[in-house]
């Protein structure tokens, strides 16, 4: 039985208990959230020794790290190195977005080397193999696509991004809309290109029940991809984006009826003043399904710093109710990310997630900041480093300049904490 089916039967599974313990909540809270469809636990029934992760309403905001090869660059060793870095700095899940050679070997190596939930975009495998087999991606068959989905489910993939909402009607809306950046989702482009070439409906939509059968058998969580997400802020919240979202709302209902866990992906590039509205719209249309956002990026003019533009948008989105942040790295729009980019991307998104969790009232979030404030007042550097999101970087920065006393090298003899104690009678308890 799937986690959703067991939740509806009132069965608290070991996975629900583990997530409850991590979140500091009662197992019954997790059970109800899964039964209602506003919490998911991505866990393929074939995966063992997984570090379980709950995503959704009332839980801490989670962070995903994308890794994977491109057609020109990448190797098993480099992707495993990125994987280990993402794990080390606190990613909650991993997605393999490989499109290069040895795509199956890469995915299997990632599965063998991680205890985190793994997600994929199966159309990438189907497209790569169709190009090799038939000479063109668009010549893949529906069976090729569903074959890729099922083979990955058998391997143990925990969640899959599928662009089911890119329908013929939605494509007509997109064509009538007019956009600056057209379609920027690779999976969305592959799907739309296939539909135009064959003059046919999206097989993931037309045969959605077949997809549900696979996911139900292996308890793979569906992540309904936003193939028409805006690729620039000028395209944000347009008719094409909303038309696809309406379809995804229908598919959320069908997935729940089939007792398959489901979450929904979202934009993309969105200006600050539209982010909250986007979250509210998704939550309404998709009946409070967990919301998984890429960023969103709040400006288009910061290549090299898009981990920052994404963290700004991610903090606002998560504070408004988004549940799951897909990290953005400094390499976004420029190149394949390297291991340093992965580190910076995860940390930036974790900062955004934590900032939002304070607003959400997530269990323990504000208390960590309170403990940091106490440690700072005491000039207790070890506790400050321990509480920081990136202790290694904080320690290196702290140690760049050696000081005579306990104050940092910025203030020295003019430390505000020490002066307050000396002249205002505000006690600073020394560590």
From Swiss-Prot:
* Annotated EC: 4.1.99.17
Residues annotated as binding Zn(2+) are: 269, 333
Pfam families given in the database record = ThiC_Rad_SAM (PF01964)
What reaction(s) does this enzyme catalyze?
5-amino-1-(5-phospho-beta-D-ribosyl)imidazole + S-adenosyl-L-methionine = 4-amino-2-methyl-5-(phosphooxymethyl)pyrimidine + CO + 5'-deoxyadenosine + formate + L-methionine + 3 H(+)
Explain how, and how many, cofactor molecules are bound: Binds 1 [4Fe-4S] cluster per subunit. The cluster is coordinated with 3 cysteines and an exchangeable S-adenosyl-L-methionine.
Q: Where does substrate bind?
A: 66, 95, 124, 163, 185-187, 226-229, 265, 292
Entries under InterPro entries matching the protein: ThiC (IPR037509), ThiC/Bza_core_dom (IPR038521), ThiC/BzaA/B (IPR002817)
GO biological process terms, alphabetically, are: thiamine biosynthetic process; thiamine diphosphate biosynthetic process
UniProt keyword S-adenosyl-L-methionine present? yes
Identify the metabolic or biological route this protein is part of.
Answer: Cofactor biosynthesis; thiamine diphosphate biosynthesis
Recorded superkingdom: Bacteria
- Give GO MF terms, alphabetically: 4 iron, 4 sulfur cluster binding; carbon-carbon lyase activity; zinc ion binding
Give the protein's cofactors.
Answer: [4Fe-4S] cluster
**Is Cytoplasm included in the keywords of this UniProt record?**
no
- Which positions does UniProt annotate for [4Fe-4S] cluster binding? 408, 411, 415
- NCBIfam families in the cross-refs: PRK13352.1, thiC
The text of the family note is:
Belongs to the ThiC family.
Family matches, as PANTHER family: PHOSPHOMETHYLPYRIMIDINE SYNTHASE, CHLOROPLASTIC, THIAMINE BIOSYNTHESIS PROTEIN THIC
What this chain does, per the entry, is described as: Catalyzes the synthesis of the hydroxymethylpyrimidine phosphate (HMP-P) moiety of thiamine from aminoimidazole ribotide (AIR) in a radical S-adenosyl-L-methionine (SAM)-dependent reaction.
| Name of the protein in question | Phosphomethylpyrimidine synthase
Organism of this sequence: Dehalococcoides mccartyi (strain ATCC BAA-2100 / JCM 16839 / KCTC 5957 / BAV1)
Designated gene of the protein: thiC
